[in-house]
Amino acid sequence: MRTPLLLQSLKTRVAALHTLIGPLASQRHFSPRFDRQLFACRGARLGDYLTEAEESLTHLEAAVNQGDATRVAWLAERLAAQIEALQREAATATLRRHENAHLPGGRLHARLAEYQEYERRLLAMKNEREQRYAERHDPQLAREITALDERLTRCRTAIARTERALERITR
């Protein structure tokens, strides 16, 4: 039966998407990013849309358990489209970082997006090093992981400082 394989594949893609979008999840957007047919939520954060995709996966699992083939097909197609849309949005996050530079606080928003992109890249590098370290316990990899942790700490400090500056402006 292909349904369990499809369901497992979609679960894997949603988990990968969660890792990809994690650092971008709290990033605010000023305009809607997705079609109303694709996402019911109108949230200002990418994490809201990721949550809806995870809910779609839960609904799909329920439909599979109930044996409703038409609903399974529709939900699977919709979830795949949601995943693709979120992947495209994550890929274009760096291109959009300056889109609101003319608005009050726009430069701060651009800087925040830049720092969040740095954080995403540092997390990816750290995860890659940790996977390699788990395979072979190389002391050089341990030093690299420590250095990446320190860089992540500085990056997160910069993100927090920029968010506080944005809060002061928007009061």
UniProtKB/Swiss-Prot annotation:
Source species taxonomy: Bacteria, Pseudomonadati, Pseudomonadota, Gammaproteobacteria, Enterobacterales
Protein name: Replication restart protein PriC
Organism whose genome encodes this protein: Cronobacter sakazakii (strain ATCC BAA-894)
Keywords: DNA replication, DNA-binding, Primosome
Intrachain S-S bonds: none
Comment block on domains: Known ssDNA- and SSB binding sites are adjacent in the 5-helix bundle protein.
Biological function: Involved in the restart of stalled replication forks, which reloads the DnaB replicative helicase on sites other than the origin of replication. In vitro can load (E.coli) DnaB replicative helicase from a DnaB-DnaC complex on a single-stranded DNA (ssDNA)-binding protein (SSB)-coated stalled replication fork with no leading- or lagging-strand in the absence of other primosome proteins (PriA, PriB or DnaT). Binds SSB (tested with E.coli protein) and ssDNA. Complements priC in an E.coli priB-priC double deletion.
Family: Belongs to the PriC family.
Keyword DNA-binding in record: yes
Assembly and interaction partners: Monomer. Component of the replication restart primosome, which is composed of PriA, PriB, PriC, DnaBe and DnaT; DnaG primase associates transiently with this complex. Interacts with the C-terminus of SSB. SSB interaction is required to load the main replicative helicase onto substrate replication forks. Interacts with helicase DnaB alone and in the DnaB-DnaC complex, probably 1:1 binding with DnaB.
Domain of life: Bacteria
